[in-house]
Amino acid sequence: MRGQARACALTRAARNADNRGSTGSYALTTSPLVTKYSESSMHAFFQRLVLRVLLGCALAALLNAPAIAQTTSPTPFRIAYQLTMPRPASHLFQVNMEIALPTPTEFVDLQMPKWSPGRYAVFDFAKNVQEFRAVSGICLPTQDCSQPGLPITRIDDQTWRVATRGTNSLTVSYKVFGDDLSGTFAQLDARHANYNGGEIFMYVVGHKPDPVTLKIDPPANWRIVNGRTSRTGQREWQFPNYDIMIDTPTEIAPDWTQNDFSVDGKNYHVVVHSFGDEGGKRPALVRDIERIVRAETAMWGAPEFDSYTFLIHFAADDRSGDGMEHLTSTQVIQPGALADPGTYEDTLDTVAHEFFHVWNVKRLRPIELGPWDFTRPANTRGLWIAEGFTNYYGHLMLRRAGLLDDARFLQRESQTITNVENAPGSRLMSAVESSLSAPFLDRGTSIQRTNLLNTAISYYPKGELLALTLDLLIRGRTNGAHSLDYVMRRMYEEFYLKSPNASYYLRGRGYTNEDFARVASEVAGINLEDFFARYANGVETPPYNEALAHVGLQLLRAPSEREPYTAGITLERDETPQPKIASIRNGSSAEDAGLNRGDVILSIGNERVTPATWTNALNRFKQGARVPFTVQRDRRTIQTFVTLGAPDVYTYRIEEKKDATPQSLALRAAWLNGKRP
């Protein structure tokens, strides 16, 4: 329709010229056709032309109207969802929608989200939709309906249009394939059903703000639990709008367990679904989660909900793993069994992170994050605050809850500094740019090779280190009177609690990076524009030692004892018999030697290597050595030499300052123990 669009544009131009009172200076007067007419006849000609083309434009717009352009009806639709799982082994969820139309309409568009709140990449959930049907009237299940089917047109990759002329209600049905245990996706099998709503439920375009109901019919003896379950055996829910409904992940199984506790009059439910050995650790898990809740509410104050649910799954495999925040719940997927000490520690780490999102992201949020446009990624410049600061506080809250000691907490921050400072992308990509690159970094899949390992850095650790630095600088600048804790509470109050509703979804309008810089400057008592310009918008290394000195600590750097030399090579993480190169650092000796991504390293210095031994083989050589490499590339064996330059991997370690003052030690104690100014 490019020609039709151009004609409409020319018509608008001619109409605008006519409205301005032009007397013959038309854009088309150079046309041989137009020059035959006198000025008056030409004016009449254009009136007829405009009318004819406008009619054509209107017809084209009706036939090709994009779904997103549909305006919201002044009268809400009545929308009811039903979810069934008649054959769990098929991995197919059955979704039915009853839609009552208060006024006649030519069509109804239904859309599947391209992405899900809490994730920032496009996942195109519509790819798992099948057997879409629609009939006139309210009729469930649709397979047994005698009513006539309604015409359906697939408008685009995520939109189905149902013609509704002559009907005041319709029933839509479709199936969704789900076999991924994840906070992002859905899984249905013989053991259980678990879903994230964005993967399962379509919405009526233009009617996301409308109230909706949901009824779930589970298989026999399966029980339902989510963050909005208010009674035993509940199967029906009412939600104020679609966005709240899909923000309610749900577990349906015969064998989940629930333990409860209360903090400051709020009820918390720890729901555990295990596929592996628990080793008797569930009571300890519940106690430790309560300690996390107490530490985080001590900083923020009481949350606005009455009840909150931790949905925790132990997948007992190496494939599953995720954590996702929601308004009244979180979903935590852990590979491995609860009985494993490492899995247990990782679970608490994820819980601390996700529960902090109750305030930071789910309520206090960048201005772009809610309500959502599910036709495109929610691009925001603020994920280094929303996610990176949450990373920082997740670790700090484990310390304040007594689940990490000082040494372990500082070791974690040291490791984060080591990871970021050794990443080549840290010198090329700012925290703000990383936030905008989230669709490429947030587990988005692509078959196209990229150079992101050399050019990108995650907003999680980048933001975490900015939070650490900013927190300690504010504490030092204000002599402990204020902190980043105080900044976050001020932001929460100004941009959520006291901010008028900006939409149907939640109160608050959200904040910009500039809003955050202003509030931080007010709390610190100094203008922090230079800090944010250099370290958030820019790529300079944050002033770690200046910040750490306020709490009697210092940052030391030394060549890595384990792998001082990598020659600029990063290996694939997947287990393979031989080391496989994932990326080559730009300007490295490996790049100079002609090594490529995808090369399989067979030997180093004539010594056969494995992923476990390759660094030891490389580290036998000294700086300046010309090391023989044998690699396999495209079924060819290639030999080359890599000259080792200066050490390219460093270890960073936060340590006690020998001259730490009593004042700095007092500031450190307030920082680590959460003393509230």
Q: For the regions a protein language model found, what residue spans apply to each?
A:
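A surface-exposed beta-strand-loop module
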Residues: 85-86, 118-189
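Surface-exposed beta-strand/loop patches in extracellular or lumenal glycoproteins
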Residues: 93-126, 199-219
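Short, hydrophobic/aromatic-enriched beta-strand segments in well-ordered soluble domains
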Residues: 95-101, 112, 156-190, 212-220, ...
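Juxtacatalytic substrate-recognition/specificity segment
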Residues: 97, 257-383
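Zn2+-dependent metallopeptidase catalytic core
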Residues: 125-128, 200, 209-229, 240-244, ...
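Extended, low-hydrophobicity, Ser/Thr/Pro/Gly-biased non-transmembrane segments
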Residues: 173-253
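Post-HExxH zinc-binding segment in Zn-dependent metallohydrolases
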Residues: 330-338, 363-364, 375-428
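C-terminal recognition in membrane/secretory proteostasis and scaffolding
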Residues: 394, 404-677
